[in-house]
Amino acid sequence: MNTMTLTPGQLSLSQLYDVWRHPVQLRLDASAIDGINASVACVNDIVAEGRTAYGINTGFGLLAQTRIADEDLQNLQRSLVLSHAAGVGDPLDDAMVRLIMVLKINSLARGFSGIRLSVIEALIALVNAGVYPLIPAKGSVGASGDLAPLAHLSLTLLGEGKARWQGEWLPAQTALKKAGLEPVALAAKEGLALLNGTQASTAFALRGLFEAQELFASAVVCGALTTEAVLGSRRPFDARIHAARGQQGQIDVARLFRHLLTDTSAIAESHHHCHKVQDPYSLRCQPQVMGACLTQLRQTKEVLLAEANAVSDNPLVFADAGEVISGGNFHAEPVAMAADNLALAIAEIGALSERRIALMMDKHMSQLPPFLVKNGGVNSGFMIAQVTAAALASENKALAHPHSVDSLPTSANQEDHVSMAPAAGRLLWEMAANTRGIIAVEWLAACQGIDLREGLTSSPLLEQARQTLREQVAHYTQDRFFAPDIECATALLAQGALQRLVPDFM
């Protein structure tokens, strides 16, 4: 099992990926403890001195002007969690819940939230024991933080709601008992600290980024395979072309194509002296289009990594000055915009792949049998597989509509502008699944096209990509039930079968 020492504010993208993919045993670095304790002491001083501070001894949202008596402060925090656990939709899977919890721990342990070390350790204990709160996927607008999802997470700490332990949904109290854990009672400020934050939005978008990286790499490999299958030129990947423009993403993608294609191959030599002057854009402009997508992936990584290590609570406790200051770090606009931009990249990766599939269907453009099968007419070959790819590409165009420009006021207009970051992040998963299906069809089609160049082979890496598929999916000599082959190729892509052929590009 993955073991990780968490130094607050220093999570790396690879650590976050590991948390998403695998259960983790988490330990808090000792350097965080003094800051955590100092912030709690500051909150206690405010309560003891009778000062009014939002979220500590007031109501919330539009009720912020309501002063709460000291004897009601614990009940205030518990009531906050219970009332805000109002999410709907399917439960998030264990991987997403685990990522949200680790992000929440990372933020709280920065020492600006006024939450006791014992509560943070209780969250860590949930992660380590594999107790995963039931968090519905929908119900947050991404400001004031991800209130509903994080309230559902926090319910389990209180022994309320449901949680999954060892694959079984149980009452939270039962799950805690089976894992050898106890519920906690929240003190002043702690319920708000748990609920306020962008951790669900950030986790949603991070999953989108992780999937987009796999899709990007797979699409580059399939684009190179298609280039060989239709006797495309290597000349558009010449480094001098891309250096002249100076777009770094484009330069790097062209380098990836040169790595995959190598200088030549038996296929390339077979048409070295052909009379074709230029390839269609879906081949020739791959570095330009995929380079723009890579730039978006890199920018998204920068924003999400900053947010993963951020303090997005409100109010914030500045213990060194003895102050609690209200602000707006809970507003997930950076995450929403990053997710929206990533959606454009995922849509374009799929759209370009679909155009290459269509190119292979056209015998005049590809110089291959119509629909990549012999005895056409009796056999329809890849005809409808390309239609499926077109349907998925079209869906993605609608899903790529930006969410960050869509705001609805909430909390009686106190919270009058929101980010919609959770929806922006969550839809990335559907887009990624669509794009993976498109790339799977291209992989099948490109390998079939190369097979039809009988006796000719591609570069070593591309032959490896073809062999990986052929170990699971046979060449098409005649029509057969097609859907299982797409499912098989899709599963291989999700396992990183093509991604591992591509050097690191992030």
Swiss-Prot record:
Keyword Nucleotide-binding belongs to the record: no
Keyword field: Cytoplasm, Histidine metabolism, Lyase
GO MF entries: histidine ammonia-lyase activity
Positions of crosslink type 5-imidazolinone (Ala-Gly): A143-G145
InterPro entries from the UniProt entry: Aromatic_Lyase (IPR001106), Fumarase/histidase_N (IPR024083), HutH (IPR005921), L-Aspartase-like (IPR008948), Phe/His_NH3-lyase_AS (IPR022313)
Residues bearing the modification 2,3-didehydroalanine (Ser): S144
Compartments reported by the entry: Cytoplasm
Cellular component GO terms held in the UniProt record: cytoplasm
Major localization listed first in the record, in broad terms: cytoplasm
Catalytic activities: L-histidine = trans-urocanate + NH4(+)
Group of enzyme by EC: lyase
Modifications made to the protein after synthesis: Contains an active site 4-methylidene-imidazol-5-one (MIO), which is formed autocatalytically by cyclization and dehydration of residues Ala-Ser-Gly.
Biological process terms in GO annotation: L-histidine catabolic process to glutamate and formamide; L-histidine catabolic process to glutamate and formate
Coiled-coil parts of chain: none
EC number of this enzyme: 4.3.1.3
Designated name of the protein: Histidine ammonia-lyase
Source species taxonomy: Bacteria, Pseudomonadati, Pseudomonadota, Gammaproteobacteria, Enterobacterales
